[in-house]
């Protein structure tokens, strides 16, 4: 794999890519605390990553990712994989006030569908309340293994694993 080109501009994307309905249903059940067959869940995630990577390659995307297939969303990702954050369900999500004010019609629809009814997990603000430590070693290992396996059967210039930006939390 090469990570640059002098012939053309390489393409990639950021953010989640659509997940299959069966994966969404399993994620919603997991977030709700319903009992799950862990092997079935992991197999569905592995298949979703493989399909997501295949579609990116077929579309002509050069720099591939797992499309965040294993993550219900980065709002829950922080609580699942980092220590030092606490949920504040009584607080309103601050969001991006300047951008929201600049594009109110878009964000009205976005918050209603993507962040509300369309979200896998309820959006609950989290606040840093202590030292930050990583605790998601097994989950990130699984994500990397799934991505490596998926990429092994397609042509890609490069690959990356998405993660939340530090600015995504307070």
Predicted regions and their residues:
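Domain-level signal for soluble alpha/beta catalytic cores
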Residues: 1-170
């Amino acid at each position: 794999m090469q990570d640059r080109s002098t012939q053309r501009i390489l393409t990639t994307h950021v953010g989640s890519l659509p997940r299959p309905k069966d994966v969404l249903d399993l994620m919603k059940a997991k977030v709700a605390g319903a009992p799950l067959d862990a092997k079935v869940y992991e197999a569905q995630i592995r298949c979703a990553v493989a399909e997501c990577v295949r579609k990116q390659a077929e579309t002509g995307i050069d720099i591939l990712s797992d499309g965040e297939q294993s993550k219900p969303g980065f709002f829950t990702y922080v609580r699942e994989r980092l220590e030092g954050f606490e949920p504040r369900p009584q607080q309103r999500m601050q969001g991006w006030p300047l951008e929201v004010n600049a594009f109110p019609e878009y964000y009205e629809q976005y918050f209603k569908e993507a962040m509300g009814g369309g979200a896998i997990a309820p959006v609950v603000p989290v606040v840093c309340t202590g030292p930050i430590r990583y605790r998601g070693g097994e989950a990130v290992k699984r994500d990397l293994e799934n991505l490596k396996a998926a990429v092994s059967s397609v042509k890609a210039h490069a690959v990356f694993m998405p993660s939340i930006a530090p600015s995504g939390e307070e």
